[in-house]
Amino acid sequence: MKTTNKLTVPDLISIGVFTALYFVLVTIATFGSAAIAPGFNNVILPAVCALISGCVYMLLAAKLQKFGGISVMGIVMGLFFMTSGHFIISFAANIVMGIVADFVARAGNYKSKKGLLLSYVLFSYGLFGPIIPMWFMKDAYIANLEARGKDAAYIADLFANINMTTFVIAVAATLVCALVGGWFGQKMVKKHFVKAGIV
């Protein structure tokens, strides 16, 4: 399959399905993070999502093998974050990392294992969009929360564990989890979908 082909209607349908699956996994990661590590859920959310979403990402790349699929998924996620009250940076991070990840995957014709792993790592960092203002735009983030009716106790709890140490942990954990999740996703695609002739 040529990666230069334009996206067709069936391609867009496939992208929509995979984006919906990715959204479900982000939702699961959000609630799971809050249950596993209350107080640190925002810190570990990108890592947890990266760990469990590799199969969806790798299957999309293997099935489509065209530029645009990964980008569209990033854009859709960014639009969701923006319309749900997050900062504009949420949209910017997802769209930028989605497009960059798409270019990296295309450089290896969507077949290079290392290229796809790097692509997935970059895409996973797009989920920092909604939370990175907590570290670097604290006052604006708090003002946004107050405008949405959040009280002082809620805000204090939210920022209790936000510091540069937890930022470094979040970045490192996301890298490791994206590599593990992406590797696992590649194994599952090869074992179950390639052999079955689905991709």
Residue ranges and their predicted role:
Residues 26-30, 34, 61, 65, ...:
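Membrane-water interface at transmembrane helix exits
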Residues 117-190:
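Membrane-embedded alpha-helical hairpins and interfacial helices in multi-pass inner-membrane proteins
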Residues 9-18, 45, 49, 68-73, ...:
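Alpha-helical transmembrane segments of integral membrane proteins
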